[in-house]
Amino acid sequence: MKGFAMLGINKLGWIEKERPVAGSYDAIVRPLAVSPCTSDIHTVFEGALGDRKNMILGHEAVGEVVEVGSEVKDFKPGDRVIVPCTTPDWRSLEVQAGFQQHSNGMLAGWKFSNFKDGVFGEYFHVNDADMNLAILPKDMPLENAVMITDMMTTGFHGAELADIQMGSSVVVIGIGAVGLMGIAGAKLRGAGRIIGVGSRPICVEAAKFYGATDILNYKNGHIVDQVMKLTNGKGVDRVIMAGGGSETLSQAVSMVKPGGIISNINYHGSGDALLIPRVEWGCGMAHKTIKGGLCPGGRLRAEMLRDMVVYNRVDLSKLVTHVYHGFDHIEEALLLMKDKPKDLIKAVVIL
């Protein structure tokens, strides 16, 4: 089968591989729509996961089941499915401990284009199909559905990790697709003031659509200073880190109130350390909590997020700005995420 792959660090190309084989609990899926992610860019061009050779990329897809293993009960060939980017091994001890994302090892719930070939192939393998797939509604646009698989679950996880309370003040650093879903999740959880940090006009408009009450442009000065000025020197209750570089943790610690929570859902693909400023951390005694987590996956979460879209709690249409048609456009769509033109939020390829 054909697939678009990481050939090595800074190397991309089309390759031929054997079609994957389904184990007794697994499924083989043919992608119907895929979306490149900035995580793919970190993986290929920063070597964030190491020097992977001939690994098919991609972890955001909806598709059609073409084969199931003998023990799969709830899905059959022909079913159209949502495939979460995180597909845990549900028989692992880490799942029993409450951390499905790290089943059988740190970040090992994220398998596609990490521990095995991803979804940018003519077919891809899904482990534990009954536990990791969700039925795709017939009338849901494919470009919206594929946003559930990563952008929605990741952004919402930022709001979950931040433990946003009714009326909480929140800063969301980065208003790309994940940050936009962080804003949407914060609003749904009852946040009061939601401050988005970003600069591209198309993202600013989308941030306001999803619930941002204020927008700060990092090009207009240090964002900590801007947040403090906006809040009369008090800072905010919660910070969601959804973009930016290694400096964002220091910024988040500086702008969150004592007793506040910082939630990181950003993929830090380069650098050896993330620095915590000593004084702003109260010399280690400010009761400022720092959390970071890979998004949850699995069938139940995918079904719940899907239903939020079906019942009009969240409109995902603002996330997708570029739609391509045809397998051969995957490379073009991926490089778009690297170049980040001003009119881009997310690109989707319909297959």
From Swiss-Prot:
It holds the Pfam family ADH_N. Coiled coil: none annotated. Optimum pH is 8. InterPro entries: ADH-like_C, ADH-like_N, ADH_Zn_CS, GroES-like_sf, NAD(P)-bd_dom_sf, PKS_ER. Its cofactor is Zn(2+). Gene3D superfamilies: Medium-chain alcohol dehydrogenases, catalytic domain (3.90.180.10), NAD(P)-binding Rossmann-like Domain (3.40.50.720). The keyword Zinc applies. Its EC number is 1.1.1.80. Keywords: Metal-binding, NADP, Oxidoreductase, Zinc. It catalyses: propan-2-ol + NADP(+) = acetone + NADPH + H(+). Binds 1 zinc ion per subunit. NADP(+) binds at residues 175-178, 198-200, 218, 265-267, 340. One of its GO terms (molecular function) is isopropanol dehydrogenase (NADP+) activity. Zn(2+) binds at residues 37, 59-60, 150. Alcohol dehydrogenase with a preference for medium chain secondary alcohols, such as 2-butanol and isopropanol. Has very low activity with primary alcohols, such as ethanol. Under physiological conditions, the enzyme reduces aldehydes and 2-ketones to produce secondary alcohols. Is active with acetaldehyde and propionaldehyde. Homotetramer. Belongs to the zinc-containing alcohol dehydrogenase family. This is NADP-dependent isopropanol dehydrogenase. It comes from Clostridium beijerinckii. The gene is adh.
